[in-house]
Amino acid sequence: MDASISNSINTADRASYITNESTPLHNVKLKDEGYKYIIGTFGIVTLIITIGLGVAINKDPGEVSFGSGIAADRSVCTEAGNEIFMKGGNSVDVAVAVTVCLGVVFPHLTGIGGNGVLLVYNHKTEKILMCLDSWPPAGTVVVPQLMLALYTAHSSFGHKSWSIILEPAIRIAREGFQVSESLIQSLKHLSPNANDDLKNWLHSLKLGTVIKSPQLAETLAVIQDKGVEALYTGSLNDELGKYFDSKSLSEPSLNKEPCSEAIGKGYRLISSGVGTAGPSLLNSLVDSNFSNSFSVQELADFLIGKEELSWPLPSGVVVSVTDKDDNYVSIVSGLGPVLGSQNLLKDGYIVGSLLHRSNLSRINSFGAPFIATTLQHKCEKRIVTGGVDLRDMLQVLPKILWGSEGVVNSVEAARVRITENSLLAEINHPPVLPFSLPPASMPYPVINVIQKRGDEVLAYDDSRSL
């Protein structure tokens, strides 16, 4: 593995360009496996609302390297991923390291106590290597299985040792990291029923100060040394045992449903499988008339009669990684809502939602990873991304795939948060409308994107990561 890497930077442009990809791609015949769902009509939104971005964003080239890219929520975790690249790691190694790191610096959104969905794909062979979903069936107890999913992916495809992969996150937890705006904003989601440890910790935080997480560092060190089994049946079992019975902890399992695939509008589209938002996402992209300029009405028409319209607003993080061997990885992880179950354990992490909404009989995960590759010219355009909420992805992906704005403007364009009863505007990305919308609570879901065109790579971090 080549040690040369790139930085997806968190500055004004937040983008990196990487060139000199050296390996030709193979051509294979693709299958057409679309997903069909019933789409009704929708009357909650009567006005056509076009989502747009009023100010163009200037882009400034970043570092040059050999086809590797990282798009993630925090620069400190991107640097952790770069560290793994420099040690000879591949995209799976890096994506796992970055995701674990985000559990340290964004503990209100993801971490050991959460779950996730991941997709691994190799573009040289055009083969899907892995789809994993750690969210259990809706209406059941949600045992935290994110670390199990990461460990499984790493065991299957990683190049470097598990110990090396966890080292950056452990170091950051021990040495400290800056309190982000996103973490401060999570106070707005604090429930009166939150445990005292979480309340006291959150109220002690100040924006921009450096804090340490020694308990979390020790927990990760145990997982580094003993493996993920320590969480469920080993020395770390006592804390989780307060919330989950021994049978649930002794029998963790991952959903290995096949990935969803579809062919449409010049692309091969790949996402996660049944039980996630993946099938509905691909169906919407293939069968819709979405373009680079579309209305909320068009999006709403897709949601009537679907469970997606009644989904709560989820939270989480998105990690997208590519390497010079054209391994593409997308990991979408979270705790459910911001702050999960509102229980901070003595082991230093927040437990995610303890129970899925029982009426969501079909969907376990509201988000999905996403990969798109052009059909006619395999090197023309490839997209690696994901999102924690289908409703956000449908406001961004059509622009990236078929619009003329480009990745940066598409990601930074205003979005509307859509719920069963209301439309909500993002505070820092307000839509241009003839009337005002109530504000959506921060922090907002991000969509971090890697785009490969020929031998050029653009890795872009959504500024909503704060």
Residue locations for each model-derived region?
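Histidine-acidic residue clusters that define the catalytic metal-binding segment
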Residues: 197-223, 228
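Short, well-ordered strand-loop elements centered on a beta-strand within folded domains, enriched
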Residues: 125-134, 247-248, 268-270, 378-386, ...
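Proteins synthesized as precursors that undergo proteolytic processing into mature forms
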Residues: 5, 9-202, 217, 233, ...
